[in-house]
UniProtKB/Swiss-Prot annotation:
Keywords: Disulfide bond, Hydrolase, Protease, Signal, Thiol protease, Zymogen. Thiol protease. Has a role as a digestive enzyme. This is Cathepsin B-like cysteine proteinase. Belongs to the peptidase C1 family. The keyword Disulfide bond applies. It comes from Schistosoma mansoni (Blood fluke). InterPro entries: Papain-like_cys_pep_sf (IPR038765), Pept_asp_AS (IPR025661), Pept_cys_AS (IPR000169), Pept_his_AS (IPR025660), Peptidase_C1A (IPR013128), Peptidase_C1A_C (IPR000668), Propeptide_C1A (IPR012599).
Length: 340
């Protein structure tokens, strides 16, 4: 009888401890959450102390992807699934290696202190696809600020936007060329400087100020010789890609990188390397990125993703996230388009 009581007491103690650890609340930017992630047996990724964010409100500035209602997505543009395309999907695929002549694919940009991820993810993938689908004839970088400021149906500029309408705008209105503020080439360069996003590096800290959305200029910088209207690059079609791993892979293999959004949780703010999956913390908002490929490491399938927080962040500007189970809704809202 005593043995039974002791066993039950031990079990209760174990369960209480287990529940306590599972439900423990960590400060998002603390040493405690970093230790918890790095010591977690099933994490699969490494966390590192960050000096980028001063608060969660500061972090939320970067989360500029707004969800498009499913009914509106279906109404505004078609959804492709590629079920009619029978092809062997490789275990690893990297658009940078598949199309090495398209320089934009390997370019990591910086959205700075503006919730313009939705615009960056879009113009980055559009630039890639323009080059790929033109056979290298349109090897350009398209302007994030042209889309950010002139697409009224996309959202609120630096305060966030919707992915789908950005691609529709590319088809209807076109987007001009650009580069970073530092390089200052093309028709309409990005006006905000590169800065360090929760890491230490060669750029100045991003600071606590969110930039106001610039006005829509519809003119090129003075030294650029091509008129604004003649510098426009347009797509022929925009469409949703079905929430399906193989459909997304086929789309990337055939036409190039895609734009997607995912839910950012508190633990992601501390990401340094590895294959991310949500371990702890609450949702902060949506973030738009560019999926350029996939792979498998230690039997874990992943998406290879280009971020817009410059090359000092994460894995040289990239990160990986678990593939095939809609981790953090990464496969739920994938957008793409074609130029021909």
């Amino acid at each position: 009888m005593l043995t039974s009581i002791l066993c039950i007491a031990s079990l209760i103690t174990f369960l209480e401890a287990h529940i306590s650890v599972k439900n423990e609340k960590f400060e998002p930017l603390s040493d405690d959450i970093i230790s918890y992630i790095n010591e977690h047996p099933n994490a699969g990724w490494r966390a590192e102390k960050s000096n980028r964010f001063h608060s969660l409100d500061d972090a939320r500035i970067q989360m500029g992807a707004r969800r498009e209602e499913p009914d509106l997505r279906r109404k505004r543009r078609p959804t492709v699934d590629h079920n009619d395309w029978n092809v062997e999907i490789p275990s690893n695929f990297d658009s940078r290696k598949k199309w090495p002549g398209c320089k934009s694919i390997a370019t990591i940009r910086d959205q700075s202190r503006c919730g313009s991820c939705w615009s960056f993810g879009a113009v980055e993938a559009m630039s890639d696809r323009s080059c790929i689908q033109s056979g290298g004839k349109q090897n350009v970088e398209l302007s994030a600020v042209d889309l950010l400021t002139c697409c009224e149906s996309c959202g609120l500029g630096c305060e966030g936007g919707i992915l789908g309408p950005a691609w529709d705008y590319w088809v209807k209105e076109g987007i001009v060329t650009a580069s970073s503020k530092e390089n200052h080439t093309g028709c309409e360069p990005y006006p905000f400087p590169k800065c360090e996003h929760h890491t230490k590096g060669k750029y100045p800290p991003c600071g606590s100020k969110i930039y106001n959305t610039p006005r829509c200029k519809q003119t090129c910088q003075r030294k650029y010789k091509t008129p604004y209207t003649q510098d426009k690059h347009r797509g022929k079609s925009s469409y949703n890609v079905k929430n399906d791993e193989k459909a997304i892979q086929k789309e990337i293999m055939k036409y190039g990188p895609v734009e997607a959004s995912f839910t950012v949780y508190e633990d992601f703010l501390n990401y340094k390397s590895g294959i991310y999956k949500h371990i702890t913390g609450e949702a902060l908002g949506g973030h738009a990125i560019r999926i350029i490929g996939w792979g498998v490491e230690n039997k874990t399938p992943y998406w290879l993703i280009a971020n817009s927080w410059n090359e000092d962040w994460g894995e040289n500007g990239y990160f990986r996230i678990v593939r095939g189970r809609d981790e953090c809704s990464i496969e739920s809202e994938v957008i793409a388009g074609r130029i021909n």
